[in-house]
A protein has these predicted regions:
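Catalytic, metal-anchored helix/loop core of enzyme active sites in primary metabolism
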Residues: 1-175
């Protein structure tokens, strides 16, 4: 739930979409859907949209990941379209949600930037849950890690683990 409060989840989804679909980040619009019913949407060249909707429950994507490519009977209630009434969408404010801005910077930076952003976020959230930093410090620390010059360039798998460790260490050193 904390990832949703900082919009780090949206930043990680952006990184994921850039990697999986080979799209530049500018082609991906991030919006906040407050009812948490619309989980993803794709707009095609004819401007039609296909969206994935469902009740807000992480058991759905976890179940699908475990049973792919089959769709098995769900363990969550059906989505009641009549009860929805309205779906609202807001532009994600990157000044308020610094984790999202940091993820965009990490993509542009390339190399291990996305790994550093993730490691920094996990460490900052841990420190927040331990009452060692304030909520707004999470975004500040993730941005500081991404803005540092430590995490660019080519890399190996062992570099990924080292980057994660160093990002967490950086966060602890910059409390």
């Amino acid at each position: 739930m904390l990832f949703r409060s900082t919009l780090m989840n949206k930043g990680l989804e952006l990184i994921e979409a850039v990697w999986l679909f080979g799209l530049p980040p500018e082609k991906i619009q991030i919006v906040v859907q407050r009812q948490s019913i619309v989980h993803s949407a794709v707009q095609f060249s004819d401007h039609s949209v296909i969206a994935q909707l469902g009740v807000p429950d992480m058991r759905i994507p976890i179940q699908y990941a475990l049973t792919y490519p089959k769709r098995v009977p769900g363990v969550v209630p059906e989505l009641d379209f009549a009860a929805l009434k309205v779906l609202t969408f807001d532009v994600a404010d990157e000044e308020t949600f610094r984790c999202l801005a940091a993820c965009k910077k990490a993509i542009k930076k390339g190399g291990l930037g996305p790994c550093a952003a993730n490691g920094a976020n996990e460490e900052a959230v841990k420190l927040f849950l331990e009452d060692k930093i304030g909520f707004l410090d999470i975004g500040r620390l993730v941005e500081a890690v991404v803005d540092s010059d430590r995490f660019g360039g080519d890399y190996t798998l062992s570099d990924v683990y080292e980057c994660d460790r160093m990002a967490r260490e950086f966060v602890r050193a910059h409390l």
